[in-house]
Every structure is written in structure tokens, then in C-alpha cells.
A protein has these predicted regions:
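Helix-to-loop junction immediately C-terminal to a conserved catalytic motif
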Residues: 8
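Conserved ABC transporter NBD signature motif
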Residues: 16-26
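ABC ATPase NBD coupling module
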Residues: 25-42
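Conserved ABC ATPase "signature" region
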Residues: 72-87
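Conserved ABC ATPase signature
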Residues: 91-95, 99
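Hydrophobic anchor residue at the start of the ABC signature
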Residues: 105
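Catalytic Walker B motif of ABC-type/P-loop ATPase nucleotide-binding domains
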Residues: 116-120
Length: 167
């Protein structure tokens, strides 16, 4: 979680230098971070950060309205693929944690990105949904020519990693 928070710019209580496009991220202004997070960096947070008082689809619309990245048909296909079609209009707070995790995952795909950060992405998913998530994120990253960074101390998402680092 700390690694993703550092790279995503939510925390800066670290020593050393993190560069993005040859620029030290500690030098970025708020405006630059907004643009980076809108166009280059996507994140699935471990704590999900969904709005429990909104429905599943409203949580996705919030993000997608900002980016305009996915069509309604594409969003509905993601809900279908992850077994959430019948949960579109259910308040997120009424969903199980695994269902909330899938909603948060869909939200992370609703934007362009150069890198997607997945912080404990399948911790509350069964094997079938974990596999579907693996296929979806791999397909989206390939389509966008993007990198995937995963942090995990528990259940591991099965991707064809270029490199695995143990910290």
C-alpha cells in the first residue's frame, strides 16, 4: 500500500527519488497531479474508496463522467463479466466486500492510463472472479500499451509479470 501511495502521489514521507517522465514527483503541482491521475495513472485502492451511499453504477459514472473513457455499453459489459449486472442499482454499502472490490476495479478501468496500480486487488475475491479480473486488466493494459503494478502480501493475482520484487 505504501509503495502505491508514494507512486500515486498520496504520500511523500519517503526518502529517495521517484521519477515519472524524468521528473521528480515531489516537484509536481496539484494541477500536474490532477492531470496525471486523469490521463496517466489509475489506482485500485486496497481500501476501495467507493461511495457507499451511491449505487454501484453511480460510483462508476462519477469516474467515467470525468474521463469519458468508456461507453455505457463497455461499462455494462464489465459489470456483466464480473457477475454484477444485477447489482447496478444497489447501494454500494449494501454490497459484499468482494462485490465492492469488483466495482472499484471497474472504476479503475474507466480512464486512460500509462500505469495501473492494483493494491491487494483480489484479496476478497473467489478464484473465478480473480481470473476474470486478471483477464480484464491484462486486456485493458495491452490495449492502452500500459504497465501494471501490483502489490500483494496475501492472495496473488496471476499475471505474466516482467519482474517480481519482494520488499
Amino acid at each position: 500500500s505504501s509503495l502505491c501511495s508514494y507512486i500515486y502521489g498520496y504520500r511523500n514521507d519517503y526518502q529517495g527519488i521517484i521519477n515519472f517522465d524524468e521528473t521528480n514527483i515531489k516537484a509536481y503541482s496539484v494541477k500536474q497531479w490532477v492531470e496525471l491521475r486523469k490521463h496517466s495513472l489509475s489506482m485500485l485502492f486496497q481500501d476501495l474508496r467507493i461511495f457507499t451511499e451511491l449505487t454501484a453504477i453511480e460510483n462508476i459514472r462519477l469516474k467515467n463522467n470525468l474521463t469519458g473513457y468508456k461507453t455505457r455499453k463497455e461499462v455494462l459489459a464489465l459489470f456483466e463479466a464480473l457477475g454484477l449486472s444485477d447489482k447496478l442499482n444497489v447501494k454500494a454499502g449494501k454490497l459484499s466486500f468482494g462485490q465492492q472490490q469488483r466495482v472499484a476495479f471497474i472504476r479503475s478501468l474507466c480512464q486512460p492510463f500509462d500505469f495501473i496500480f492494483l493494491d491487494e486487488p483480489i484479496s476478497h475475491l473467489d478464484d473465478d472472479n480473480a481470473h476474470i479480473m486478471e483477464e480484464l486488466v491484462t486486456g485493458e493494459a495491452k490495449k492502452q500499451g500500459a504497465g501494471i503494478i501490483v502489490t500483494s502480501i496475501g492472495k496473488h493475482i496471476e499475471l505474466k509479470y516482467d519482474r517480481i520484487l519482494k520488499l
